[in-house]
């Protein structure tokens, strides 16, 4: 009789419970993004936290806080929307390159954390106003600013020395609106 867990016939929690520390994480059923907090607490010592941090869509800020020494902070910084308060609280743990690329940050937050922001990624992925860009002209990546931010012709003229000469300002495909 085969006592191997059958991923097609059981929930992720059942599969992990039955497999224990021998769980094949590649075979965990698709409902894995619904592991309960109680389940994660009970099995915290055998869960693959890289896998949980990447796959678990209902991993809330409170759950991340509870399991802060177990989660993979690169995945946490990438795969879920984090509040600025949460990022501030865990500023020593988050991956700032990923935060600058994947989180939505206010200009005020970027100003307060200017030494942590990855300006190359922020210049491409964060919405920045002309006043903000002007204030941080020595930090921003002008190639990305000229490609991905909406800039007025007056601003372009004023900051012409910073703007790469070969830039055609393809703002019609700007990912930031």
Label the model's feature ranges.
Residues 2-177:
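Alpha-helical scaffold segments
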């Amino acid at each position: 009789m085969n006592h191997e867990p059958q991923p097609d016939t059981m929930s992720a929690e059942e599969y992990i419970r039955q497999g224990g520390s021998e769980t094949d994480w590649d075979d965990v059923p698709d409902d894995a993004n619904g592991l309960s907090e109680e389940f994660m607490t009970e099995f915290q010592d055998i869960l693959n936290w890289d896998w949980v941090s990447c796959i678990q869509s209902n991993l809330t800020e409170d759950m991340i806080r509870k399991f802060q020494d177990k989660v993979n902070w690169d995945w946490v910084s990438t795969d879920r929307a984090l509040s600025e308060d949460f990022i501030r609280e865990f500023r020593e743990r988050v991956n700032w390159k990923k935060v600058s690329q994947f989180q939505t940050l206010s200009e005020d937050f970027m100003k307060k954390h200017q030494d942590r922001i990855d300006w190359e990624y922020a210049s491409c992925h964060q919405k920045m106003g002309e006043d903000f860009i002007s204030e941080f002209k020595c930090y921003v990546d002008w190639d990305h600013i000229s490609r991905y931010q909406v800039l007025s012709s007056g601003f372009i003229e004023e900051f012409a020395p910073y703007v790469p000469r070969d830039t055609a300002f393809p703002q019609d495909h700007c990912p930031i609106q």
